[in-house]
Amino acid sequence: MQIGIETATEQPLAAVFERVRQRDIGTRVRPNLDQVYAFLKEHPDLRFPGAHNVLLYRHKDDPRTDGRMHVEYAVQVRRAFARTGDVFASATPAGRIATATHVGPYERLGDTHGDVQRWCGANGHRVAGIDWEIYGDWTDDPTRLETTVCYLLA
């Protein structure tokens, strides 16, 4: 796996937010993205060809979270929009990022996150507390799933 530094531009997202324990994130993806896709079905002007699912994590040291993570379950969209129910406009941040492409089952994404975090520490890069995953096109072969892991740098 290759880890590198890139400059990211802001990418608008349609998202649903939830505080969830890390071990439960996988079971919450489908119900939350179903809400986003139902919204996008009613707002087709926001969609664009090749848009991907994104999970965005905002890490906050807040004792009230009780070990739960701030997770935004999202889909890339053309532009910001007015909030409708639980679906709101969000965005991946612009700036310098450390990034790597994970190839393989989603259950192993934690390994790639760990690799990027260790690489950042070993190379003098501080993470800013926001990271995200961009899910590539679906395939039935879990060994060929591609997910881009990004960490905003401080």
Regions found by a protein language model. Give the residues of each.
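A solvent-exposed interaction/effector surface
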Residues: 1-154
